[in-house]
């Protein structure tokens, strides 16, 4: 399984390099709905645009909740304070993807292999980042599309 995961990472890096995409966020993703391993890559510009759009939308409902005196409701519409982790809004979605067997049931060892493979590829991902100090790596977990995230700086 580790070799398959590493192949997906390598393919994503190849695609990003061939398209001259500076990597701001690199997400190794397990598609829980149709068993597959995939990579999504975001740029700083795309992330900022997504955050701005999210915050514009959220502000409407935040304001309504505050006007209604609903603090619990307002808390649901807090602003994003920095970076998008919404994989579907990334610059490159499913840039490299490999389907797994339809009956595949991931266990803790699978999710550990995801993280370990991405940690092992940190230097390669960093080499394609426009700014390694702001590079973020992400990985899916058993229950979350984005469960872990870390920086290399």
Question: Language model features by range: what are they?
Answer:
Residues 24-27:
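Short, hydrophobic-rich beta-strand element in sensory/regulatory alpha-beta domains
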Residues 6, 10-18, 22, 33, ...:
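Acidic, proline/glycine-rich low-complexity IDRs
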Residues 47-115, 122-124:
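Polybasic, proline/glycine-rich intrinsically disordered low-complexity segments
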Residues 29-31:
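Short beta-strand micro-motifs enriched in acidic
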């Amino acid at each position: 399984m580790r070799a398959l995961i590493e192949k997906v990472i390598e393919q994503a890096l190849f695609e990003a390099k061939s398209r001259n995409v500076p990597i701001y966020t690199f997400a190794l993703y397990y598609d829980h709905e149709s068993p597959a391993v995939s990579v999504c890559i975001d740029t700083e510009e795309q992330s900022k645009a997504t955050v701005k759009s999210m915050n514009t939308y959220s502000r409407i409902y935040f304001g309504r909740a505050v006007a209604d005196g609903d603090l619990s409701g307002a808390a649901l519409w807090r602003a994003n304070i920095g970076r998008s982790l919404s994989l579907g809004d990334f610059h490159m979605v499913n840039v490299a993807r490999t389907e797994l067997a339809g009956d595949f049931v991931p266990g803790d060892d699978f999710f550990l292999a995801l993280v370990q493979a991405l940690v092992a590829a940190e230097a390669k991902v960093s080499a394609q980042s426009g700014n390694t100090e702001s590079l973020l790596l992400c990985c899916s977990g058993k229950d979350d599309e984005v469960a872990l995230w870390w920086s290399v700086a």
